[in-house]
From Swiss-Prot:
Enzyme class name: hydrolase
GO biological process assignments: methylglyoxal catabolic process to D-lactate via S-lactoyl-glutathione
InterPro entries listed in its UniProt record: Clx_II_MBL, Glyoxalase_II_hydrolase, HAGH_C, Hydroxyacylglutathione_Hdrlase, Metallo-B-lactamas, RibonucZ/Hydroxyglut_hydro
Cofactor(s) recorded in Swiss-Prot or TrEMBL: Zn(2+)
Amino-acid positions noted as binding Zn(2+) 2 in the UniProt annotation, renumbered to this chain: 58-59, 132, 170
The entry's keywords: Hydrolase, Metal-binding, Zinc
GO molecular function: hydroxyacylglutathione hydrolase activity; metal ion binding
Lineage of source species: Bacteria, Bacillati, Cyanobacteriota, Cyanophyceae, Acaryochloridales
Annotated protein name in UniProt: Hydroxyacylglutathione hydrolase
Cofactor binding remark: Binds 2 Zn(2+) ions per subunit.
Quaternary state and interactors: Monomer.
Pathway assigned to this chain's UniProt record: Secondary metabolite metabolism; methylglyoxal degradation; (R)-lactate from methylglyoxal: step 2/2
Length: 252
C-alpha cells in the first residue's frame, strides 16, 4: 500500500491510499476534491472508497463531489455519525475490519474530539489514520466528548506497537511541541524533536507521519502519568493531568 500525503485548506492533510497491484485507491478524510482528483489522474488509479474518521466539514468536504464523480464508491464512517457524514454508505463500529487492496484496517472507536470519532489501523503495514484524536505532539480539542473519553482513546492508541506510523490530519506539530516544552522543558527527546520540527517547517517540510514510540516519548497527552508533568500542571492523577493540559493548550 502506497500512502500519498496531500495538502488541503490551510493545514489539513488528506491521505490517498493506492494499491499498485490492483490499481485501486481510497482516500482518508478528503477536505477538498481537487488534490484527490489530481493525484488519481497522476496514478491512473480508480477511487473505490472514502474513509472518514469523523463528521467535521474539513474531513468530509469532498465527499459529495467525489461520490458524484465515482458513484459506486463506498463511504465509510462511524455508526455514531449516521446523518452527519455526507454520502455515508457504511456504518462502522469498534472491532470492524475493512479490506483495502492487499491489506485491511481494524476500526478503533476513539471518541473525545467528537462523540463518534474512529481511527483506522492497518496492522499488516503498521499505519494508523487517527484524524483529530492524536496529533504530532498533541491531541484534538474536546468538542463533543469528555476528558475521560479522550484520555481512554489516547491510551488505546498508546498500546499500539511503537513503530506504528501516525498519520494525523493536521500540521500542528510545531505549536504542539512548543506547548509541550512549557510542561516538560527538561525532556531531551522533546527538545531534539522540537528543534528538528522547527528546521523541517522552515524548509516547508511536513512533520507527518510520526510514530507511536515518538509520541509516547514527547507528547504530554500520552505522558499524563509522568510525575514531573503532573507537578507542572498541579495535578495528582492522569485524568486530572490530562484535563489541565487540555485546558492550558486551548489557551496557548
Amino acid at each position: 500500500m502506497m500512502i500519498y500525503r496531500l495538502n488541503a485548506l490551510t493545514d489539513n492533510y488528506i491521505f490517498l491510499l493506492h494499491d499498485p497491484q490492483t490499481g485501486t485507491a481510497a482516500v482518508v478524510d478528503p477536505a477538498e476534491p481537487e488534490p484527490v482528483l489530481a493525484k488519481l489522474a497522476e496514478l491512473g488509479a480508480t477511487l473505490r472508497a472514502i474513509f472518514n474518521t469523523h463528521h467535521h466539514w474539513d474531513h468530509v468536504g469532498a465527499n459529495c463531489a467525489l461520490r458524484s464523480r465515482f458513484p459506486d464508491i463506498a463511504v465509510y464512517g462511524s455508526s455514531e455519525d449516521q446523518g452527519r457524514i455526507p454520502e455515508q454508505t457504511v456504518f462502522l463500529k469498534a472491532g470492524d475490519r475493512v479490506p483495502f487492496g492487499q491489506t485491511y484496517f481494524d476500526v478503533l472507536f476513539v471518541p473525545g474530539h467528537t462523540r463518534g470519532h474512529i481511527a483506522y489501523y492497518a496492522p499488516t503495514t503498521g499505519d494508523l489514520f487517527c484524524g483529530d484524536t492524536l496529533f504530532g505532539g498533541g491531541c484534538g480539542r474536546l468538542f463533543e466528548g469528555s476528558p475521560a473519553q479522550m484520555l481512554d482513546s489516547l491510551n488505546q492508541l498508546r498500546q499500539l506497537p511503537e513503530e506504528t506510523r501516525v498519520w494525523c490530519a493536521h500540521e500542528y506539530t510545531q505549536k504542539n511541541l512548543s506547548f509541550a516544552l512549557t510542561v516538560e522543558a527538561d525532556n531531551p527527546t522533546l527538545q531534539e524533536r522540537y528543534a528538528q520540527v522547527c528546521r523541517d517547517r522552515a524548509q516547508g517540510k511536513a512533520t507527518i507521519p510520526s510514530t507511536i514510540g515518538l509520541e509516547k516519548a514527547t507528547n504530554p497527552f500520552l505522558r499524563c502519568e509522568v510525575r514531573s508533568i503532573q507537578i507542572a500542571v498541579g495535578a495528582t492523577t492522569p485524568l486530572q493531568t490530562f484535563t489541565r493540559l487540555r485546558g492550558k493548550r486551548d489557551q496557548y
